[in-house]
Amino acid sequence: MARQYFTDGPYIDPPVSNLTTLTATTIEDMWAGITWTPIFANDAKAGKMYCVRAGGTISLTGGTAIITPQWGPAGTTLGASLTVGTVTATIAAWYLSFDLVFRTIGAAGANSTCVGAGFMAFNGGVVSGSANPNIIAFGGTSATVDTTINGNITIRKTLSGVNSVIPQWVSIFSRN
């Protein structure tokens, strides 16, 4: 039977196995945006909203976290999070949500504008008798981008402590 979504494409099926385990203490892509969260050339329209959802597991030894959303092959930053303190956690679940809205669409070149916001949430570990979960908000920076070429939404993470982040799934859809 054909797909009968109440949402709009791009229609990219989520991965059927875990993506690469991430362990760097420097900035790194959480997944390959060109593969898992693409936005095809000329698909964006003024007012169109793209939604990215992802989840997996995370292990941390405390430290800090920064989450940075980016657009397209040039890596245009859409507003990094504040530097947030993290707790120690072992194999905690995480969930990420990011919505990107195109405000204007222009001619070829960086003549279209978009803005987005989202969050990454994961359970807290027990540190000195506390069990604080982390919710890291990011985005909010309006950006000028080129929508006449293939683009993508890439979410990047920077964790300062020893860490293991396993993206288990990621999806993209548009609401309109």
Spell out what each predicted region is:
Residues 2-176:
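Surface-exposed molecular-recognition determinants
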